[in-house]
């Protein structure tokens, strides 16, 4: 699950 609020998750997220 990818959360936009979270700075970093299991996968690389772009803030």
UniProtKB/Swiss-Prot annotation:
It comes from the Eukaryota. It is found in: Secreted, Cell wall. Keywords: Cell wall, Secreted. One of its GO terms (cellular component) is extracellular region. This is 40 kDa cell wall protein.
């Amino acid at each position: 699950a990818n959360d936009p609020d979270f700075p970093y998750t299991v996968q690389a997220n772009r803030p």
